[in-house]
Amino acid sequence: MTKVVEISPTTRLEGHSKLTLKVDDQGIVERGDWLSITPVRGIEKLAIGKTMEQVPKIASRVCGICPIAHTLASTEAMEASIGCEIPTDAKLLRTILHAANRIHSIALHNILILPDFYIPGTEKKFNLFANEQPARSVMARIVRIREIAQTIGAIAGGEAIHPSNPRIGGMYYNVSPRAKQKMADLAKEGLVLVHEQMEFMFDVIRNMQNREFVEVAGKQIPLPKKLGYHNQGVMATASMYGSSSLDDNPTWDFTRWKETRPWDWYMGEVTIDLEDPSYPIGGTTKIGTKANPQMEACTGVPTYDGQPVEVGPRARLATFKNFDEKGTFAQHIARQMEYPDCCYTILRCLDNLNTSGKVLADHIPQGDGSMGWAANEAPRGSNIHLARVKDGKVLWYDMLVPTTWNFPTCSRALTGAPWQIAEMVVRAYDPCVSCATHMIVVNEEEKIVTQKLMQW
């Protein structure tokens, strides 16, 4: 008999989300809905009527994890709308900033997922805050990797959190020769460390992949060989940086995108009739509680060619590097493989960067209302911003954020997993739920949402 269990909130990811799961008598997920319950940010509406210079600053505040990706995607969406090409050295600085942000994000994700994994050769899971090896050395390496990445980002971008250097038309300033050398030295140090961390993570992930059971709340839970598999496609615009409607050959087509309402996708009202008080942390939702994912979800459901897609590291490697593994562990492996690529990208950009070069376009048009889009391959996947700018003011704005793409795909990937490890499937997407929340609650008591209206 099918029962319903709910995990709310999910843990060790950014933002607030929950899992509403229909499971069989063995606790295997027959249908899973992963949905955002994070308060809406409302960035798209805040952008209307603002100057094109203001909107990237506003968009970067959608969350504290992804401000660089949103700054770059938003800035380049404005440039695409007004038809502004930026100088080569400005693009190099943006790419350095982008790659540094990805390194920082991968390292942070290592911290979030390692407690799910076992120390190879033992029956002990990782506790990165334990005063023992290998936790101490691993944590020290991760912290240093993040420090290197954030420092490079601060030099190239002005700040590591909300970068102040990118602007419409390029960058406010170039870097000095000394700053260029500092970034090169850091990237070389980082390259050694990320190779070590990548190999370490490979060992940890493959060790887990070979296990038959994992322990959750004192219970031995079977670990499926096809954990996190789904039949959806993948979407990526580049292996490293991205694409825009200004490109000669754009790698994303906005006419193939459609956004649907959550009540067209998620399950309707259900009653929780399976509960586990021992589930970490604090137990699952109590029996008798009503849940209504299609009315509670605070995101739209974007589709490409009429279907949800997976975005992120595995999608990038599958699209551009013939990576053919699937599922939860493949996502983890793919993310680690991007570590050294980022350092190599930074070093290549620095080799080509002319510190005396121009970083601001000679002419910045004010726009005629044309639609422009930019896709930034953020750490979590394709981060696509769309804009219409006229006379320097934003007429219309939309954000298609990586986790927004991944919500429906991950929901399908939950099928076949024991419900106790459903969060492991979710964490493999490295969600940033705050970024993905773009619906407005109009009935707070019943958590009813309104459709995000799309205008063309």
From Swiss-Prot:
Membrane topology: Peripheral membrane protein
Broad class of the protein's primary localization: membrane
EC main group: oxidoreductase
Cell compartments where the protein resides: Cell membrane
Cofactor: Ni(2+); iron-sulfur cluster; FAD
Annotated signal peptide: none
Documented EC number(s): 1.12.98.1
Record's keyword annotation contains Transcription regulation: no
Regions crossing the membrane: none
GO molecular function, one term: coenzyme F420 hydrogenase activity
Family recorded in the similarity comment: Belongs to the [NiFe]/[NiFeSe] hydrogenase large subunit family.
Subunit structure, interactors included: Pentamer of two alpha chains, two beta chains and a gamma chain.
Name of the protein: Coenzyme F420 hydrogenase subunit alpha
Organism: Methanosarcina barkeri (strain Fusaro / DSM 804)
Gene that encodes it: frhA
